[in-house]
């Protein structure tokens, strides 16, 4: 096992990365190794997808499957070894079908990619794990060095984050052939184990630029189906009655669940990154979407244990449900998996609803505590002139984007302390689950404009980018000249690709933490600092002083 893709990875003087019987996330060595094997199979599939496009062949089954299967290897998504192997087998079957399509056009069609003809050696998980050793990400570290390995992993993990957003967009009916062609090209190239530093740096920026397009179609998918988010108050306390909790990012799953629970007497609560759903008109119209429950994903083993109903996980993040003994009432969807828990294959939530009706639910309603969400792209753009007016009248000094992933490290209290230290004449724009560090606190307003503005899920960084570009255009300056600072927390691969997106768009002087990615060497950090001004957090006082004086 070797995995260094998330922020909580093991760090020792000898090196970074989880390389024991089990990773810090709970992923076993078996599952981790089989995920490496799956990635190799997906690289071979992408190699043939690139070749097929040379013949004018676009196989939508391949395009639909590839990013989804890659998503299953993201942190805290799928811990179920047999299902990972199932994805690998499906990848190989699709590859062979695509290869046959190519050969039907050109009998001499061939693909030089080293992953292009990969076959699984056995049905036995142990044998497959031994085969996976050929594809462990750091297998040639001694030959290429830590810097090249780090850049390879930056590209691989960044592309993995983009694949997750591609799957979210696909679920909502969004497809862009250019994006998929670019995805396959990059995925296939990474299967050649590239070792050129400049080419890898260029690839990282290409992934960032591609992901900006992915976030654009994801935004289109969400707003076309569910309307543009508008500011909405959400209760974060319990309401009497039977209940279901839904977590993750998949708004379509939430919509289906709301439709199927309407009139049943079962209330629905959002959790984690599902919180922004309350801002969408077509979702909040359901009166039994009664509120948001819990806090950051890392607290779920305590909070889920206390929730008196079933829980549905639609995407990341799931952690061991046996710890809180709620494994008999947690359900996984799509690419999510945990050994031994119930998995919903389709869109029928009937078994979950039936379980909810058998459980007690909340015995009474608590005193409501309301927070505001729903500052989507249209709302943000509608406030652009107000922001400019406040800046010109010196009522608004600075905007801080404080957001990103949450996690368990105590150092993440930095982001709570930073938000509460922001001066009263400054505004906080937030997104993703890092907001749970401070989103239930009171921040007041500036002439009626809330000082805490919740822009949505992690992918809604797109809205923040569009706002920044709009403000810069209206003020006749560059984005980096705005009174705007980005203070970002990271945990997994979606955050990595958001960072690459920002860097590829030329955004500079980002402050990130609580620690640098484990695959970033001192040399790579120095390069990113020199090119983009990227740096790690220090202390709240020092960072605040520096950002306000910039």
Swiss-Prot record:
GO CC annotation terms, alphabetical: cytoplasm
Organism name: Salmonella paratyphi C (strain RKS4594)
Protein name, as recorded: Hydroxylamine reductase
Co-factor(s): [2Fe-2S] cluster; hybrid [4Fe-2O-2S] cluster
HAMAP family: Hydroxylam_reduct
GO MF term list: 2 iron, 2 sulfur cluster binding; hydroxylamine reductase activity; metal ion binding; peroxidase activity
Xref: InterPro entries: HCP/CODH, Hydroxylam_reduct, Prismane-like_a/b-sand, Prismane-like_sf, Prismane_a-bundle
Function statement: Catalyzes the reduction of hydroxylamine to form NH(3) and H(2)O.
Binding site residues for hybrid [4Fe-2O-2S] cluster: 249, 273, 317, 405, 433, 458, 492, 494
Family matches, as Pfam families: Prismane
Compartments, record wording: Cytoplasm
């Amino acid at each position: 096992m070797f995995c260094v893709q998330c922020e909580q990875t093991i760090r020792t003087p000898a090196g970074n990365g989880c390389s024991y019987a089990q990773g810090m996330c709970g992923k076993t060595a078996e599952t981790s190794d089989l995920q490496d094997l799956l990635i190799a199979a997906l690289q071979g599939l992408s190699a043939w997808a690139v070749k097929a496009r040379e013949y004018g062949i676009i196989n939508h089954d391949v395009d639909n499957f590839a990013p989804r299967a890659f998503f299953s290897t993201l942190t805290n998504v799928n811990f179920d070894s047999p299902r990972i192997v199932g994805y690998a087998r499906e990848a190989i079957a699709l590859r062979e079908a695509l290869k046959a399509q190519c050969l039907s056009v050109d009998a001499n069609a061939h693909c030089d990619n080293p992953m292009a003809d990969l076959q699984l050696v056995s049905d036995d998980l142990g044998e497959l794990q031994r085969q996976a050793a050929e594809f462990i990400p750091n297998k040639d570290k001694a030959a290429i060095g830590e810097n090249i390995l780090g850049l390879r992993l930056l590209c691989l993990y960044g592309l993995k984050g983009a694949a997750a957003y591609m799957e979210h967009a696909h679920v909502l009916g969004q497809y862009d052939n250019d994006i998929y062609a670019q995805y396959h090209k990059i995925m296939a190239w990474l299967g050649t184990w590239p070792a050129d530093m400049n080419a890898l740096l260029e690839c990282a920026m290409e992934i960032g630029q591609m992901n900006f397009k992915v976030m654009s179609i994801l935004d289109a998918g969400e707003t076309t189906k569910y309307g543009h988010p508008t500011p909405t108050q959400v209760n974060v306390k319990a309401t009497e009655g039977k209940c279901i909790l839904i977590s993750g990012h998949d708004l379509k799953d939430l919509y289906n669940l709301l439709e199927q629970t309407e009139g049943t007497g079962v209330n629905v609560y959002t959790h984690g990154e599902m919180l922004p759903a309350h801002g969408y008109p077509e979702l909040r119209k359901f009166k039994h979407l009664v509120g948001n429950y819990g806090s950051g994903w890392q607290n779920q083993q305590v909070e889920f244990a206390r929730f008196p109903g079933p829980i549905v996980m639609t995407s990341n993040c799931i952690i061991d449900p046996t710890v809180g003994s709620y494994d008999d009432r947690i359900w996984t969807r799509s690419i999510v998996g945990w050994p031994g828990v119930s998995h919903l294959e389709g869109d029928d939530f009937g078994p979950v609803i039936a379980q909810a009706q058998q459980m007690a639910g909340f015995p009474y309603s608590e005193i409501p505590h309301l927070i505001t969400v729903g500052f989507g792209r249209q709302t943000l753009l509608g406030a652009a002139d107000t922001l400019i007016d406040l800046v010109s009248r010196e009522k608004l000094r600075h905007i801080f984007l404080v957001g990103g992933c949450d996690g368990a490290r105590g150092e993440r209290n930095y982001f709570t302390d930073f938000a509460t230290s922001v001066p009263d004449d400054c505004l906080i724009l937030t997104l993703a689950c890092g907001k749970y560090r401070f989103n239930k606190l009171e921040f007041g307003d500036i002439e009626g404009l809330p000082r805490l503005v919740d822009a949505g899920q992690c992918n809604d960084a797109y809205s923040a980018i569009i706002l920044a570009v709009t403000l810069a255009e209206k003020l006749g300056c560059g984005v980096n000249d705005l009174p705007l600072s980005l203070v970002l927390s990271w945990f997994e691969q979606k955050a990595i690709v958001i960072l690459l997106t920002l860097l590829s768009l030329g955004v500079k002087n980002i402050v990130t933490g609580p620690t640098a990615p484990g695959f970033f060497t001192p040399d790579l950090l120095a390069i990113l600092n020199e090119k983009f001004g990227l740096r790690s957090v220090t202390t709240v006082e020092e960072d605040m002083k520096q950002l306000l004086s910039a």
